C-alpha cells in the first residue's frame, strides 16, 4: 500500500503523468547486475557467468537477469566481478558522463553502487 501523503505529493509533482507512474507499481520488477570492467572483460564475463543475461540498453556494463538466478549467491558477486544494482540506478552515472580526471562527490554513497560505477 502506498501512503496517501506520498500519492498526493507525486500527483502534484507529476500532473498528467501520475497515472502512468501508478501503473508502474503493478508491473513486474526488473533485476539487473553491472559488470565490473576493472575485473573482467565483457567477452570473458559472458562466457563464464552461468546466467542468461540481456543488456540494459542505457547502461554500458549493465545486464538484466532472471530473479530465480540469484546472482548474489555466486562467488563472482563476492569477488566484485559484478555488482547487483537496480537498472534505473545505473542510468544516473550514464547520464552524468564523468570524464577521466574529473572528481565527483557522491553525497548519497551508501552502499556505493554508483560510486563503483563511476570508478
Locations of the language-model features?
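S-adenosylmethionine
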Residues: 1-119
